[in-house]
Amino acid sequence: MALSPEEVNHVAMLARLALSEDEKTAFAEQLTLILDYVERLNELDTGEVEPLIHILPVFNVLRQDEALPGSSQEEILSNAPLVEDGQYKVPRII
């Protein structure tokens, strides 16, 4: 499937790329080679191949949730530069 420089220009316009004429010609040749290779891959008979989600047999390895004691409000707020009424105080933005 040969791509013309005009088709490359159209794709470049959609991608908002500015290409020189030499680049358009070079990309047309390179993209043609890529598309030809993909066409060859499409010809493969994969009817006997089982669909894969992942190439390796990896499964989720999960651990049991364990509730741990949290920090107190005083401990958490002790790191803040400004605190007011048990809350972080930050400078006004607007």
Swiss-Prot record:
SUPFAM superfamilies: Glu-tRNAGln amidotransferase C subunit. InterPro entries: Asp/Glu-ADT_sf_sub_c, GatC. One of its GO terms (molecular function) is asparaginyl-tRNA synthase (glutamine-hydrolyzing) activity. Its EC number is 6.3.5.-. The keyword Hydrolase does not apply. HAMAP family: GatC. This is Aspartyl/glutamyl-tRNA(Asn/Gln) amidotransferase subunit C. It comes from the Bacteria. GO terms for biological process: glutaminyl-tRNAGln biosynthesis via transamidation; regulation of translational fidelity; translation. Allows the formation of correctly charged Asn-tRNA(Asn) or Gln-tRNA(Gln) through the transamidation of misacylated Asp-tRNA(Asn) or Glu-tRNA(Gln) in organisms which lack either or both of asparaginyl-tRNA or glutaminyl-tRNA synthetases. The reaction takes place in the presence of glutamine and ATP through an activated phospho-Asp-tRNA(Asn) or phospho-Glu-tRNA(Gln). Keywords: ATP-binding, Ligase, Nucleotide-binding, Protein biosynthesis. Heterotrimer of A, B and C subunits. It catalyses: L-glutamyl-tRNA(Gln) + L-glutamine + ATP + H2O = L-glutaminyl-tRNA(Gln) + L-glutamate + ADP + phosphate + H(+); L-aspartyl-tRNA(Asn) + L-glutamine + ATP + H2O = L-asparaginyl-tRNA(Asn) + L-glutamate + ADP + phosphate + 2 H(+).
